[in-house]
């Protein structure tokens, strides 16, 4: 089996849908409590964050909806649950800030990415406000106009 190339930033998976659906206001770095088979699957980049979010309950943060696919070579005596809730490790001040902000109307806490930081797995979570449909269209229009501008600049340089 060929070795997988390491991502230069150590990113394992990203939640691009969260950036599309929310205005990201604050980002936090949280540790993840994982079992052995989950770490092996993360090394093989078998993780999806598409519909994952953070649940704040009883002064703790939990990652919900994150799907880590178990490897076929994983241990047979452990029953692997790919969508189990995983505890996020944050300090008290960060938890209080998240809890107070989520209780406000329109704020949500979502997972943006999972990455390696040295030998530890970290999860980047963000506090965001939901976008309306017209906000999404406006963002798309801005992105298209920026692309057109870059193309014009690039073609102008080639003519000279």
From Swiss-Prot:
Q: What is this protein called?
A: SsrA-binding protein
SUPFAM superfamilies reported in the protein's UniProt record: Small protein B (SmpB)
Q: Which NCBIfam families does its entry note?
A: PRK05422.1, smpB
Q: Which Pfam families match?
A: SmpB (PF01668)
The major lineage groups are: Bacteria, Pseudomonadati, Pseudomonadota, Gammaproteobacteria, Pseudomonadales
- In which compartments does the protein localize? Cytoplasm
The residue ranges crossing the membrane are none
Q: Which organism is it from?
A: Pseudomonas syringae pv. syringae (strain B728a)
Family, similarity comment: Belongs to the SmpB family.
Q: Name one GO biological process term.
A: trans-translation
Keywords in alphabetical order: Cytoplasm, RNA-binding
For whether the record's keyword set contains tRNA-binding, the answer is no
Taxonomically, which superkingdom?
Answer: Bacteria
Function description: Required for rescue of stalled ribosomes mediated by trans-translation. Binds to transfer-messenger RNA (tmRNA), required for stable association of tmRNA with ribosomes. tmRNA and SmpB together mimic tRNA shape, replacing the anticodon stem-loop with SmpB. tmRNA is encoded by the ssrA gene; the 2 termini fold to resemble tRNA(Ala) and it encodes a 'tag peptide', a short internal open reading frame. During trans-translation Ala-aminoacylated tmRNA acts like a tRNA, entering the A-site of stalled ribosomes, displacing the stalled mRNA.
**Region (Disordered) location:** 131-160
Which Gene Ontology cellular-component terms appear in the entry?
cytosol
Any one GO MF term held by the record is: RNA binding
For this chain, the annotated S-S bridges are: none
